[in-house]
Structure formats: C-alpha cells, structure tokens
Amino acid sequence: MNQNLLWFEKLKFNNQDLIPAIAQDYRDGTVLMMAWMNSESIQKTLSTGEAHYWSRSRSQLWHKGATSGHIQKVKELFYDCDGDTILLKVEQIGDIACHTGARSCFFNAVPIYPQS
C-alpha cells in the first residue's frame, strides 16, 4: 500500500462499511454537516480535492454540490483518536451546506436547563 495511505488502515468502518464524516468550515470552525463515507468516497475525495460522500438513501456515491453548485473544497482531512470518525475541513462554495438552504445543517437549538 502507498505509504501516504497507511492511515487509511487505522479507520474503523461500521457493519455497513461506512464511517461518519463531519464537514467543518476551515475558516471559522462552523460545523456544517454530518454525512457518511465509505472507502470509495474517501478515495474520490482525496483524488479530486472535493468532498464525496455515500448516500444511504440512494445507495450511491454522492459528490457534494454536484447539482446545486455548493461543492466542498477539502482543505484538510483528519480522523479521530479512535479512528471511527472523519473530520473534513472545507471551503463551502456558495456558503450553503444544508439541503434546506441553510449554511449549516445544525440550526435546531435545544434549550439546556441545568438541574439545581
């Protein structure tokens, strides 16, 4: 295996051969979205420099923004200490990551009521 891909062997995919991937704005740290990746989408992301995910609903490779134009240019890729989550630091073209038209998919705030 290519020395540059030795890290890939450390990844822990679930029983569907998927791994969660968080997309984060590389400039301000905003968490934009969570999606699933498989080995094919990771390889495609690395070879193109643009985020590719695995669509569980369509069971196919998904080039983020291919239809909308809101592609994600990957600036950095990390994996966590357990090897079971990927973090993509991206430049979000068009400043829209969510299919709802929002910048981030995480716009549903839940109030926290500390217990006394």
From Swiss-Prot:
<dbReference type="GO" id="GO:0005737">
    <property type="term" value="C:cytoplasm"/>
</dbReference>
<dbReference type="InterPro" id="IPR026660">
    <property type="entry name" value="PRA-CH"/>
</dbReference>
<comment type="pathway">
    <text>Amino-acid biosynthesis; L-histidine biosynthesis; L-histidine from 5-phospho-alpha-D-ribose 1-diphosphate: step 3/9.</text>
</comment>
<feature type="binding site">
    <location>
        <position position="84"/>
    </location>
    <ligand>
        <name>Mg(2+)</name>
    </ligand>
</feature>
<dbReference type="GO" id="GO:0000287">
    <property type="term" value="F:magnesium ion binding"/>
</dbReference>
<comment type="similarity">
    <text>Belongs to the PRA-CH family.</text>
</comment>
<keyword id="KW-0460">Magnesium</keyword>
<dbReference type="GO" id="GO:0000105">
    <property type="term" value="P:L-histidine biosynthetic process"/>
</dbReference>
<dbReference type="GO" id="GO:0008270">
    <property type="term" value="F:zinc ion binding"/>
</dbReference>
<comment type="subunit">
    <text>Homodimer.</text>
</comment>
<keyword id="KW-0614">Plasmid</keyword>
<keyword id="KW-0368">Histidine biosynthesis</keyword>
<feature type="binding site">
    <location>
        <position position="81"/>
    </location>
    <ligand>
        <name>Zn(2+)</name>
    </ligand>
</feature>
<dbReference type="InterPro" id="IPR002496">
    <property type="entry name" value="PRib_AMP_CycHydrolase_dom"/>
</dbReference>
<dbReference type="InterPro" id="IPR038019">
    <property type="entry name" value="PRib_AMP_CycHydrolase_sf"/>
</dbReference>
<feature type="binding site">
    <location>
        <position position="82"/>
    </location>
    <ligand>
        <name>Mg(2+)</name>
    </ligand>
</feature>
<dbReference type="GO" id="GO:0004635">
    <property type="term" value="F:phosphoribosyl-AMP cyclohydrolase activity"/>
</dbReference>
<keyword id="KW-0378">Hydrolase</keyword>
<keyword id="KW-0963">Cytoplasm</keyword>
<protein>
    <recommendedName>
        <fullName>Phosphoribosyl-AMP cyclohydrolase</fullName>
        <ecNumber>3.5.4.19</ecNumber>
    </recommendedName>
</protein>
<keyword id="KW-0862">Zinc</keyword>
<feature type="binding site">
    <location>
        <position position="80"/>
    </location>
    <ligand>
        <name>Mg(2+)</name>
    </ligand>
</feature>
<feature type="binding site">
    <location>
        <position position="105"/>
    </location>
    <ligand>
        <name>Zn(2+)</name>
    </ligand>
</feature>
<dbReference type="Pfam" id="PF01502">
    <property type="entry name" value="PRA-CH"/>
</dbReference>
<keyword id="KW-0479">Metal-binding</keyword>
<feature type="binding site">
    <location>
        <position position="98"/>
    </location>
    <ligand>
        <name>Zn(2+)</name>
    </ligand>
</feature>
<keyword id="KW-0028">Amino-acid biosynthesis</keyword>
<comment type="function">
    <text>Catalyzes the hydrolysis of the adenine ring of phosphoribosyl-AMP.</text>
</comment>
